[in-house]
Amino acid sequence: MKKFIAKLLLAVLPIAIYAGIFVAFEPNDYFGLQGKDTMITRVKQYGASNINSIILGDSRLAHIDMSLVNTTAGREYYNLAFGGASLEESIDLVYFAKKANPKLNEVVLGLSFYTLNASYNTQNRISTIEKQLKNPIAYMSNLQYNTQLATALLGALRGVPLQEGVETSEHTKEDYEQNGEALPYRKDLIAYASVLYNKCAKPNTLTLAKPTQDATLAGINANEISAAQLANEMLKVTKSSSLWSVNEQQLMRLCELGDYCKANDIKLYFVLPPMDISVRELVCAPLGIDKAMLDVIEKLKANDAIVLDYEWTNAPSYKDTQYYDGFHLDTVHGLPQWTKTLFTDIIKG
């Protein structure tokens, strides 16, 4: 009997060690022991929050200061936005939130030309997460989360700190010139705009850009790429090179969501966060995205939706230093200001 117990303990020991490591280091804090703010913790904790106003969207809304939101609005909001969220996932989360909290009465849903792009496809994780919230074993056996665990462990062993939600930087004169010549936009903004072409234009539309923002910026800093020539190349691109089109299926779902919210006494706001002028001029105008998005806004308004548009028709005149990159506001220098603007507009009705 003792030998059997010893063998059993020996067999169970690796599983116990693995479970302990998983619980301690898995990056989504499924078990709530690490005090992290992740997509899964936000979804998991919403049902017990008793908060009737929610925010949804991708990273442009995921990092807003919730204490500033609540102070500005004079009521409490719960943030269900997360980095990399597709429009499909955000819409699905509205229905999830209504099931979790039947008293839900307000939804602030972020969207943009990027998430409305028909070629922007991500795996919809919401139904999977709903199942895994009820089944920890399914969560622990998920390949994607185990890969994330390995990455987190490797980072911990290397002493690499995690700075979740922090997107801020300071800029100097060198960021605006190359070889002593002034540039039309900040170097990193030019590099970032070139990367957006990977999602919005035909392959090889740009001959000077590299596949990633970091690689392009490194090429600019090493004088291997002329930032001015790259910007000019983007300006010369025509609509014929565009692969961008409206995701009509998700646009229809947005309209259906409007009808659902109206039928259930939920106030729905569609919010288009601001972007730097470099994205508008280098990406959207040459590829014809701007005109198509104006049509989208009109369709949403025609469905009696409340549209708060800071991307196109009501773009704030922020300095480029208030943007971390062309698409995301700096979490220190820009995002707080826009957060106040957004929720001041919301309480005005």
Where are each of the predicted segments found?
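Membrane-embedded segments
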Residues: R60-L149
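Active-site segments of SGNH/GDSL-like serine hydrolases
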Residues: G258-A285
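C-terminal regions of proteins
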Residues: A285-G349
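Hydrophobic membrane-insertion alpha-helices, especially the h-region
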Residues: A6-E26
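Alpha-helical transmembrane signal-anchor/signal-peptide segments
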Residues: A24-Q45
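Secreted/periplasmic serine-hydrolase-like ester/acetyl group-modifying domain
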Residues: R125-G258, K262-N264
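Short extracytoplasmic
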Residues: M39-M66
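Short hydrophobic beta-strand that contains or immediately precedes a catalytic carboxylate
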Residues: S53-G57, L80, L329
